[in-house]
Amino acid sequence: MSHLAELVANAAAAINQASDVAALDNVRVEYLGKKGHLTLQMTTLRDLPPEERPAAGAVINAAKEQVQQALNARKAELESAALDARLAAETIDISLPGRRIENGGLHPVTRTIDRIESFFGELGFTVATGPEIEDDYHNFDALNIPGHHPARADHDTFWFDATRLLRTQTSGVQIRTMKAQQPPIRIIAPGRVYRNDYDQTHTPMFHQMEGLIVDTNISFTNLKGTLHDFLRNFFEEDLQIRFRPSYFPFTEPSAEVDVMGKNGKWLEVLGCGMVHPNVLRNVGIDPEIYSGFAFGMGMERLTMLRYGVTDLRSFFENDLRFLKQFK
């Protein structure tokens, strides 16, 4: 205890003489380490009378705190000096060009959706959306596809239980819209749909867009004119287009639309038809007063045709070498 002040003075001198952080840490160990000079002073307390030990211990702790503060201050000085030296040694060539920030790009399917929404937006269509987890009423029953209908088997549906499913088409959005508002109705419904299928031209999840018009005096001629204009605008060519009879439970008459490819072969691009009277009745619209047409198309398929992509799965593999081609 008698030479405590001397130990503090010696520690202060050693701290001031430390030229780097490593040397400073050696001083810390020498005085405050497990076997350091000041730490060992605590062992002398056992030689003192019990009533003197608290005061003596406080003096030793104050000395240790004084040394610790000196260590902290010196460490801050050394670190600041080291930083100044490093900055002084470094040179920055301000004439060098900055690092280029690479801009991202839209996914090709997103480009297709935006392009189609823009076209139909100019015709007065609004975008409508709905849930991807659907019930069988909106996905099937209301669309004139009752439980016993063979068309249900064509959809390869992902079922959660007896009534809940991942929607196989965005047609449920049409049902919800017609239930929520009276004609005139003019909507497009883009979104993800799900079917249990996977190969070069099918994936379990894909994007679909459906369109719907319900009003008075809507005819198949209106449908043909609208889709003619759309396809020629989308592909930016004066395409040869044909409508061939088909069958969909929710439209009557129904048709599939083909375009002539560059190889001289017909390519199917979408399905369409006049809204079936049963569908209108299911949503409370009088088919004696109103009529309408609907169409549906796969976004990936149109994107493949527009950009010449041969494998549908390329859109979902997140390969930047592929995606950067569409920037």
Swiss-Prot record:
Keywords: Aminoacyl-tRNA synthetase, ATP-binding, Cytoplasm, Ligase, Magnesium, Metal-binding, Nucleotide-binding, Protein biosynthesis. Its EC number is 6.1.1.20. GO terms for cellular component: cytoplasm. It holds the Pfam family tRNA-synt_2d. GO terms for molecular function: ATP binding; magnesium ion binding; phenylalanine-tRNA ligase activity; tRNA binding. Its main location: cytoplasm. Signal peptide: none annotated. SUPFAM superfamilies: Class II aaRS and biotin synthetases, tRNA-binding arm. It comes from the Bacteria. Binds 2 magnesium ions per tetramer. Its cofactor is Mg(2+). Mg(2+) binds at E252. Tetramer of two alpha and two beta subunits. This is Phenylalanine--tRNA ligase alpha subunit. It comes from Salmonella newport (strain SL254).
